[in-house]
């Protein structure tokens, strides 16, 4: 089993950067997709804030706020310019004020692995940042991506200058920008994009300096496959994510790509995958649930990019799993707002059950059945749930059906 220590969880005298993780009652909405920049997005979300709050979401993950060479926001250039394809700085700040009014935290997508230059420098590459805020020169760019800085401390993001986080002046400027987002603009949470691209030690430094209430990193690499498909044992995959979390000083969560990879195969009649060799959930959720942000799809895996989509006919089975289980569930905008009122309302019902039964990120899981066409578990000793078309219901008169849908059912005591 993967190793971690839970000193951080047990400390009650941490600063507020630990409070949200210790509480463990988060439900996140990813509030955009890959096409959102084509619409008046900040204004669109402004109109949805009351529903987001009423539905039980504690935080909404917003797209990258800064000016970017690509409209989606993932090729940032002038970090301090908040006029983007999603809308103006004025509309963004208005949205953030409304979210605060409705007690929904705003999560900023922090894209600091790479930055597009404005002028040509060393080697004729666009690796200088003249004429904009944070006017770095080539020493801010890693040597492996055309700069005069040091080698990268992580994986390269090809095609654009990668930021050299070993440089003190770079880290100082990034911290200043993060503090500005946190204290002046109005974001409370951070999501670190392409977190494999630089050492988790720097994530630890940035969180410690800017003090977001909650942070999550994107550590996405391939699951373990063999000639016949997905391996049953994904321990090495989840251990890589666990190791990244540990290297942040345990103060950041991470997206549970292991659970996503397993769950989207399990719903195809392979529910035996949802129980590991120790009888626990097989993803990061099974080893370190308080740091595991579970999800079905995001703007990369789903939406119009569809790099690794969850099977569309099984989406509600997926949400019945992550919304009743430990970890920190994250719901995708498309599923919640674009796939019809039935799915929207079923998700809201599951969130409501989670709240009423006080299921949280550390709730216990007792797997009762994990067969080809049936998965059943008791979570927190408060709810019981099943997935699949196998016939099953909990024994005992204590259980009352709370909700059900296509290939899922949930009971409570």
From Swiss-Prot:
Coiled coil: none annotated. It holds the Pfam family Alpha-amylase. Keywords: Carbohydrate metabolism, Cytoplasm, Glycosidase, Hydrolase, Metal-binding. The record marks 300 as: Transition state stabilizer. Disruption phenotype: No visible phenotype under normal growth conditions. It is found in: Cytoplasm, Cytosol. Gene3D superfamilies: Glycosidases, Golgi alpha-mannosidase II. Substrate binds at residues 74-75, 191-196, 220, 222, 239, 246, 280, 286-288, 299, 305, 386, 411. GO terms for molecular function: alpha-amylase activity; calcium ion binding. It catalyses: Endohydrolysis of (1->4)-alpha-D-glucosidic linkages in polysaccharides containing three or more (1->4)-alpha-linked D-glucose units. InterPro entries: A-amylase_bs_C (IPR012850), A-amylase_pln (IPR013775), Alpha_amylase (IPR006046), Glyco_hydro_13_cat_dom (IPR006047), Glyco_hydro_b (IPR013780), Glycoside_hydrolase_SF (IPR017853). It is an enzyme of class 3 (hydrolase). Its EC number is 3.2.1.1. Belongs to the glycosyl hydrolase 13 family. PANTHER family: ALPHA-AMYLASE. This is Probable alpha-amylase 2.
